[in-house]
A protein has these predicted regions:
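Active-site-proximal loop/helix of nucleotide/amide-processing enzymes and allied scaffolds
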Residues: 1-78
Length: 78
């Protein structure tokens, strides 16, 4: 598996269930490379926009690789 699709509906289901006001997204890259793909950035933007509509702030999206990570917030992708 080299890709996985996630929808805003899936992301925010638990957040809304517990009346959360913010979330942090986190996923791994089995390849070990923590660099965000174009799809990672596009999906993050979509989820951030959905969060604004729902009133749930997306604080960060962190990608885990081999002994490293990338914060999309730190890299200013969001």
């Amino acid at each position: 598996v080299n890709a996985s699709l996630v929808t805003p509906r899936e992301v925010f289901a638990e957040a809304l269930k517990y009346n959360a006001v913010s979330v942090v997204l986190l996923h791994n890259h089995p390849s070990g490379d923590a660099a965000p793909s174009h799809n990672d950035i596009a999906v993050t933007d979509r989820i951030v926009q959905a969060g604004k509509i729902l009133g749930v702030q997306v604080i960060d999206h962190i990608i885990i690789g081999d002994n490293t990570y990338t914060s999309l917030k730190e890299k200013e992708y969001m």
